[in-house]
Amino acid sequence: MNILHISPYVPDVHANHAGGVCMGKQVETLKKNNHVTVLTFVNNEYEQGLIKNHPDYYYVQTSKGSFVKNAISHLNMPNMFAIRNSKQFRDLFIKLIKEKDIEVVHAEFTAMGQFVLIKDMFPNIQFNLVEHDVTIQSYQRQVQDSKGLKHIYCLAEYNKVKKSEAMYLSKVDHVMTFNQKDANLLKKNYSCNNVKVLNPYYGIDFSESNTIDKIPNSICFVGQMGRNENHVAAMRLIRIFKKLNQKEWKLTIIGAYPKQELLDQESENIHITGFVDDINKEILKNEIAVFPLTYGAGIKLKVLLAFGLGLPVITTSIGAEGIDESGKVLCLAESDDDIANAINELLSNRDLLKQVSQKGIEFVREKFSWNKTETIFKELYQ
């Protein structure tokens, strides 16, 4: 089939964030049996470098100015959708559909669902949307956790998201999620009955062996630090770590675009990496991973990544969503004290550490095989 893959970020299995990695794997898989054209946004200097590895990709360059202009021009849309409402992108989108004789659009992230309106111009085209998370759920949590003017803003955005997401989902041919819980949420909130559940790709090839030495008594957090939910969780973990008062222990916050507040926490036993070339190697230096997330939505690929790399993971119920919500292999902890106790228990018991590590690897291999996604793609695109 002739497929047009559209995304808000550059798809690449070597991207520095989980969404980009997962999209890159989808493109690779789709290309095995189809003619795939990729159209994406390039959002920063890092992605400018990334796009050079893909001379066959079509793209539109964004800037802070273009984001502001688009947001102001489309006040009826939630900001995160409005910034992608680009005339340049839309014109190129239409041009490629015509030139490449596109039969199916494969869109990533809810914001790209707005381009489903292309079906008014091309009624025979199929439009499939991958919901990396259920956007309305994320905004519900922000409304609950905010106060004052921020609460008013979040509530207004929530209402716009609900209206926009409902409209997009009513028009698409198929919706894909990365876990059954998100599929159930779409059915509950929007009466979606055309949902397929994929397994996400989180960046691990289990055929590769690693010989990276662990730093004794080391803890890590992983995430794109420009995202507020990751920043808040990292700052929370630092507070917990400081209260543990273990001078021989090390904490590493791994991820690009850390805010100054986070950078200011750098000390003898707290390290803020910023961007790293090989995130897997950086994670593997550590003995455990901790994700004290308080909001966000969808499956947390960073949790799967750490888990699959053999690190025992301590996280909240939000971090466990779509992975192991009953805590069979994840260590679930909600309060700061519970998280601190879980860290102490793991780092003070080497046998338990090894046992949980092996269980995690086996769990990810069994439950999150990419083969399931390959099968679904073959069914959809034949």
Where are these regions (language model features)?
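Donor nucleotide-sugar binding/catalytic pocket of nucleotide-sugar-dependent glycosyltransferases
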Residues: 126, 155-158, 162, 166-208
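Acidic donor-binding loop of glycosyltransferase active sites
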Residues: 284-298, 309-311
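Short hydrophobic beta-strand element within catalytic cores of glycosyltransferases
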Residues: 302-305, 312-315
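Conserved acidic donor-binding segment of nucleotide-sugar-dependent glycosyltransferases
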Residues: 329-337, 345-350
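A charged, aromatic-enriched C-terminal amphipathic alpha-helix characteristic of glycosyltransferases
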Residues: 351-381
